[in-house]
Amino acid sequence: MARVKRGVVAHAKHKKVLEQAKGFYGRRKNTIRAAKAAVDKAGQYAYRDRKVRKRNFRSLWIQRINAAARLEGFTYSRFIFGLEKAGIEMDRKVLADIAGNDPAGFKAIADKVRAALA
């Protein structure tokens, strides 16, 4: 069996890591050992922050709904309770969008909530 020299494979692996490290600062962009560590850590941050992004957006939507609900005389929790009682099934993303872009529409929803709570 012929001897296989691994130079081509190693070069390809190194090239792949260095391409992923493009734009990094200092040694992290051109030294294979530092680049590999930096790329691994970047992957960990990316994985974690894909989860955190979902939390952050939900929090933002809640803040926007709360602000709009308070203009209508509700607290956030009373408003959400009223939505459930009125049978309005709308997620927080859509409610936040309506609150920001269609104040008249949000007022109509708030009126239905007010009627359901009365």
Curated annotation (Swiss-Prot):
* InterPro entries linked: Ribosomal_bL20 (IPR005813), RIBOSOMAL_L20_CS (IPR049946), Ribosomal_protein_bL20_C (IPR035566)
Which Gene Ontology biological process is one annotated for this entry?
Answer: ribosomal large subunit assembly
Cell inner membrane listed as a keyword: no
Q: Which Pfam families match?
A: Ribosomal_L20
| Keyword flag Glycoprotein | no
> Which GO CC terms are listed, alphabetically?
ribonucleoprotein complex; ribosome
The GO molecular function terms of this record are: rRNA binding; structural constituent of ribosome
Keyword terms of this UniProt record: Ribonucleoprotein, Ribosomal protein, RNA-binding, rRNA-binding
Could you tell me which HAMAP family the record lists for this protein?
Answer: Ribosomal_bL20
Mind telling me which PANTHER family this protein's record contains? Answer: 39S RIBOSOMAL PROTEIN L20
- Similarity annotation: Belongs to the bacterial ribosomal protein bL20 family.
| Function summary | Binds directly to 23S ribosomal RNA and is necessary for the in vitro assembly process of the 50S ribosomal subunit. It is not involved in the protein synthesizing functions of that subunit.
State the name under which the record lists this protein: Large ribosomal subunit protein bL20
Q: Which organism is it from?
A: Phenylobacterium zucineum (strain HLK1)
